[in-house]
């Protein structure tokens, strides 16, 4: 079984969401580097990332950026053909920053920041994964197929420009030419299995790889894709 893993530290981690909006989790407040990383992503996969909407998440920084730095980041991302559309909810300083930038806050990120200020509520149980959804026909370019709380099995082809998403695992018994995203609600244990692997993009729990990041020796092969230590792994099936 061949295995491929390409690890490198990034100033910003881009996670793909299930509704077509990505989250840019900023790890290092190095504006030129962040802009260059996003510009490189657009260059490698323009159909996926050009003019893509992103949410800026400053939650991993010890302090939010000042207004001048935040403006430089937003303007630089726009110049790189990436569109910041919101800021992840955070502290009062981030609230003020969002107002100054004219970007809305997303309240679903509130718990991430208030975790240490209030007692944590009991963990919510994850909805059980059902028996799964089966797709018999081709998923054509421009179509999106989502299997909520279950696995997705496709007995045909996923065309270029098509998108298949599942909260569980994804099994594709034809050719994958489009995008496949498993573990869409954040379950990092989910996997993608494919008989003929020619994907534009693959993602597990938001972590992703695009076509140019996938070794050529795996294209056209039967593979499995999984997440290990927050890194996408791809292996040919024997």
UniProtKB/Swiss-Prot annotation:
Annotated GO biological process: cell morphogenesis; division septum assembly; regulation of cell division; regulation of cell septum assembly
InterPro entries: CAP/MinC_C, MinC, MinC_C_sf, MinC_N, Septum_form_inhib_MinC_C
Domain of life: Bacteria
Gene3D superfamilies attached to this UniProt entry: 2.160.20.70, 3.30.70.260
UniProt keyword annotation of Cell division present: yes
Keyword terms of this UniProt record: Cell cycle, Cell division, Septation
Stated family: Belongs to the MinC family.
Subunit structure: Interacts with MinD and FtsZ.
Function (record text): Cell division inhibitor that blocks the formation of polar Z ring septums. Rapidly oscillates between the poles of the cell to destabilize FtsZ filaments that have formed before they mature into polar Z rings. Prevents FtsZ polymerization.
UniProt-recorded name of the protein: Probable septum site-determining protein MinC
UniProt organism field: Xylella fastidiosa (strain Temecula1 / ATCC 700964)
Gene: minC
